[in-house]
């Protein structure tokens, strides 16, 4: 049976959105590679936004240009940008594989089968959200290169919102868990193999979302600390506390809502733990530079975040295994039980 008109239109729109996402990925990838080389139009190295080793307070008071707050070191920034680029590549590969699978299995007797497959795999709205993620991330890196920390903080907040929306869309497609499970049962049999691929993609995006939560706290407070007069130690504590509050809120939402759609959601908690561990190294440099007596308190706060993340990992593992081993109980036959009562 030929595809319906609705399926044909949705498939073409979806294909155009995937092509746009692929072109945006190529643009962002070339940009992220070019920004690492000097004399290509970028004034500063984006990864040296807070290089404490390059600051010499005894000569020319170089710190007056920008207040150096708590931030991750250049190596961590480069690794973060590189991993995000690899995640973008993985998502593009996922969409291309899904598109190829749908095209190879669009001949079916079911009406609007292609539309149901596209909706469950990742529809046009998720593709354009993915484009917004890449564009806002590119804007964030550009702002760091130009030392516009306030603009960089704003761009990263927009990126984080888009990243969160994309994760929620990829998991739920903005429908109830019952409708999502029903749509999963109705997808084409040839697409069953992409379910595991989608689960891997979701967990990796959740992992980077957890690490990006830490990045959100330190980037936002870096912009605030360079926009208004505020003590550096207050900015440092605000960064960690923002990370803690946001991570707890996201973890509760995952355990209360999102696990009804995808059971093995461990990625965010792992990223949360990696963020706490990764931020501990800059704190040691921060202590050496400022000779701060507050570093112990900062480390304790990070330890609390790490313990909470481990607790959520254990909680998710226990709930996943218990749910997996749960079996249906045999229903009691009310008619036979009533007959037995009468005989007695």
UniProtKB/Swiss-Prot annotation:
The lineage of its organism: Viruses, Duplodnaviria, Heunggongvirae, Peploviricota, Herviviricetes. This is Envelope glycoprotein M. It comes from the Viruses. The chain crosses the membrane at residues 13-33, 77-97, 126-146, 148-168, 204-224, 239-259, 264-284, 294-314. Interacts (via N-terminus) with gN (via N-terminus). The gM-gN heterodimer forms the gCII complex. It is found in: Virion membrane; Host Golgi apparatus, Host trans-Golgi network; Host endosome membrane; Host nucleus inner membrane. Pfam families: Herpes_glycop. Belongs to the herpesviridae glycoprotein M family. Keywords: Disulfide bond, Glycoprotein, Host endosome, Host Golgi apparatus, Host membrane, Host nucleus, Membrane, Transmembrane, Transmembrane helix, Viral envelope protein, Virion. Residues 1-12, 98-125, 169-203, 260-263, 315-344 are intravirion. One of its GO terms (cellular component) is viral envelope. Envelope glycoprotein important for virion assembly and egress. Plays a role in the correct incorporation of gH-gL into virion membrane. Directs the glycoprotein N (gN) to the host trans-Golgi network. Residues 34-76, 147, 225-238, 285-293 are virion surface. It is a multi-pass membrane protein. Its main location: virion. HAMAP family: HSV_GM.
């Amino acid at each position: 049976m030929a595809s319906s008109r609705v399926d044909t239109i949705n498939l073409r729109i979806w294909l155009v959105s995937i092509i746009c996402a692929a072109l945006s990925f190529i643009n962002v990838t070339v940009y992220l590679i070019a920004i690492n080389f000097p004399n290509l139009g970028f004034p500063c190295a984006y990864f040296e936004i807070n290089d404490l080793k390059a600051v010499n307070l005894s000569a020319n008071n170089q710190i007056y240009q920008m207040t150096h707050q708590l931030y991750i070191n250049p190596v961590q920034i480069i690794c973060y940008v590189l991993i995000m680029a690899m995640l973008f590549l993985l998502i593009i590969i996922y969409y291309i594989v899904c598109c190829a699978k749908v095209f190879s299995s669009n001949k079916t007797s079911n009406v609007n089968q292609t539309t149901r497959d596209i909706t469950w795999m990742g529809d046009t709205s998720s593709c354009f959200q993915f484009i917004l993620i890449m564009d806002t991330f590119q804007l964030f890196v550009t702002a760091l290169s130009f030392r516009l920390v306030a603009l960089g903080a704003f761009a990263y907040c927009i990126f984080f919102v888009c990243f969160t929306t994309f994760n929620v869309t990829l998991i739920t497609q903005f429908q109830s868990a019952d409708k999502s499970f029903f749509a999963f049962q109705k997808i084409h049999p040839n697409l069953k193999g992409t379910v595991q691929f989608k689960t891997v993609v979701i967990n990796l995006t959740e992992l980077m979302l957890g690490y990006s939560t830490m990045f959100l706290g330190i980037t936002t407070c870096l912009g605030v600390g360079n926009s208004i007069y505020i003590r550096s130690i207050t900015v440092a504590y605000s960064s960690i506390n923002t990370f803690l509050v946001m991570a707890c809120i996201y973890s509760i939402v995952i355990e209360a809502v999102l696990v009804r759609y995808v059971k093995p959601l461990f990625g965010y908690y792992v990223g949360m733990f990696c963020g706490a561990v990764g931020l501990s190294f800059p704190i040691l440099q921060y202590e050496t530079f400022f000779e701060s007596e507050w570093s112990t308190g900062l480390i304790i706060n990070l330890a609390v975040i790490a313990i909470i993340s481990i607790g959520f990992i254990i909680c998710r593992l226990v709930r996943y295994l218990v749910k997996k081993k749960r079996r249906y109980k045999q229903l009691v036959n009310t008619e036979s039980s009533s007959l037995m009562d009468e005989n007695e």
